[in-house]
Amino acid sequence: MRPTKLAMTKLEQYESMTEAEAVRRTVGAFRDEFFVSEEKAQLACEIAVREKKLLSKLDYKDGFSLYVGIPFCPSVCSYCSFSSSPIAEWKDKVESYLFALLKEIRAIGKMSEGHRPDSVYIGGGTPTTLEAEQMDRLLKTITENFDLSNVLEFTVEAGRPDSITEEKLAVIRKYPVTRISINPQTMQQKTLDLVGRNHTVAQTKDAFYLARKLGFDNINMDLIAGLPGEDASDMEDTLRQVEEMHPDSLTVHALAIKRAARYGQEGRKQDLHSEISQMI
């Protein structure tokens, strides 16, 4: 369910009207067709209007978004279904993967001549499982093979705090990266231990403040609502701790256990809808 996508579709249907009238009709449609409360319908429309203004800056004719994946993590979280492997088990393959990746980046750069990316996103996995020198080569290859003059956002998913070092952050700062993400998922140590995230709450805070010290002024943090063993009070405490850190943006996901995740393979059932609803 993506409520802002529904709102965007409705707003586009009423494009010939004033913004106020389009919003009024969209809120009515949410209420009458989807039985959504007035408050939530208004919120969906407000976000959709903001998104519409941001999306209007994209070059749909000649622009594109570039995604680069690093499929390694310090450890694989129990709930994760992404294609990622523990870095320790694949250490001898990382250099080969990077060699092939850089070759592909150069090839895509040639294929996309005449076009400029609107956004660049380095995700995974955990990109900062790469060594600083490897990260340097990756970012250098991207900047040398694409015209980044039109980029609205360049993100490096720093991700797990136990993979973040001052040396790696200093490398990222050398390049036109505009946003990084440091992702605790929760600030409850008992949960981190339970789901296989082998880092501490203190490491999250240390990584965040280190990034601030080095000059990063657009730091996102990811949280997951509904992690095993957590209730609304745990989420409230996590949000309180995150608020004290003042990240520039916050992304909250609802837990979804998929077949590829270890929890999914173990047949664990998810019955947390009411708890997640309270958290959100």
Cite the ranges covered by each PLM segment.
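N-terminal [4Fe-4S]-dependent radical SAM core
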Residues: 13, 20-66
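Canonical Radical SAM [4Fe-4S] cluster-binding loop centered on the CxxxCxxC motif
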Residues: 61-96
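Conserved non-cysteine loop/helix-boundary elements of the Radical SAM core domain that shape
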Residues: 84-278
